[in-house]
Design a protein with these regions (language model features):
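Lipid deacylating catalytic domains
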Residues: 1-53, 57-63, 101-158, 162-290
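Contiguous, non-catalytic segments that form substrate-binding/exosite surfaces or channel walls
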Residues: 84-108
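N-terminal accessory alpha/beta regions
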Residues: 44-91
Length: 290
């Protein structure tokens, strides 16, 4: 019997572990979040995954080269929630400063210095996505086919980092090509969708920079310390769709740290997908959906 609901993930920028390993780790991170944050012990999570790193890299990341793999945290308490975190006030102030700079520079020059740094230094795959027609067409088709494969089910689509851009673009395409198709919940984590250059690219293909028409709900999760999600408030940038669906921005604490047996040990990564996937705020949505 096929489950009525399914969660579909799409990974972000840079090379990844093998295609049979990466989705397993995403699924385990979601399940760990349910167990730690919601007290729900289950392995029965209907999950599918769109892997695209092979389109950019000749071989996946090996175990020896992967310094920040998924690993199950040894604690038993819930992961830290944003509302109770000791750094909340400091992070809020930092967000206001960064957001003000982004908006001011974009308003008066059309570009952002922070945006340029992120695109040039951190998001080389994104440059290829916009410059390489073959890559862009192929990765979009992969996700489009994956979504349509599950068209008779309730779908939660989770896009991390650059994967959130690919997901957004495909959802806008499907809105034009398959207007009856539905994605119940679109979730973006560590997303660069707020960058001015990304919004400009969206505006070149679409009438408005807005919520995709086929989406019933859109939630954006961002750790304020995540440089890729430097503009964390997408609700300021994306108009609602015709049904009035607007993106809901939810700040979170990405508590991921690298394992003790990797160098550097116990190193934080505020952009890491596994940290986002086991935040209490995301776990609550997964629990209610699944």
């Amino acid at each position: 019997m096929v489950d009525a609901s399914i969660i579909i993930g799409i990974h972000g920028l840079a090379n990844k572990p093998p295609p049979d390993e990466k989705p397993t780790w995403w699924r385990q991170a979601l399940i760990e979040g349910l167990r730690r944050n919601c007290g729900k012990t289950t392995d029965l999570l209907s999950f599918d995954f769109l892997y695209w790193a092979d389109l950019r890299y000749p071989a996946p990341v090996s175990d020896n080269d992967n310094t920040q793999p998924y690993w199950s945290d040894q604690g038993v308490d819930p992961f830290p929630a944003y509302r109770s975190h000791k750094w909340t006030e400091i992070i809020n102030v930092a967000e206001k400063i960064i957001g003000t700079e982004l908006d001011f520079v974009e308003l008066h020059t059309g570009i952002s210095r922070i945006n340029d740094y992120v695109l040039e230094r951190e998001l080389t795959d994104l440059g290829a996505y916009y410059d390489d027609d073959g890559f862009r067409t192929t990765v979009r088709k992969r996700l489009r086919d994956k979504l349509l494969e599950h068209r008779d089910r309730r779908i939660m689509l989770i896009g991390h980092s650059m994967g959130s851009i690919i997901a957004y673009d495909v959802l806008r395409m499907l809105g034009r090509e398959e207007p009856q198709f539905r994605v119940d919940h679109f979730i973006t984590i560590g997303s660069p969708l707020g960058l001015p250059h990304v919004k400009f690219k969206i505006s070149q293909e679409n009438d408005l920079v807005r919520t995709p028409s086929i989406v019933g709900r859109w939630t954006n999760f961002a750790d304020r310390r995540d440089i890729v999600a430097v503009d964390a408030k997408l609700s300021d940038d994306y108009e609602p769709n015709d049904q009035g669906i607007k993106v809901n921005d939810v700040p979170v604490i990405n508590a991921y740290r690298s394992p003790a047996n990797k160098k550097p040990p116990n190193s934080p990564n505020y952009h890491k997908s596994y940290g986002y996937l086991r935040t209490p705020e995301l776990s609550e949505l997964v629990r209610a959906f699944a």
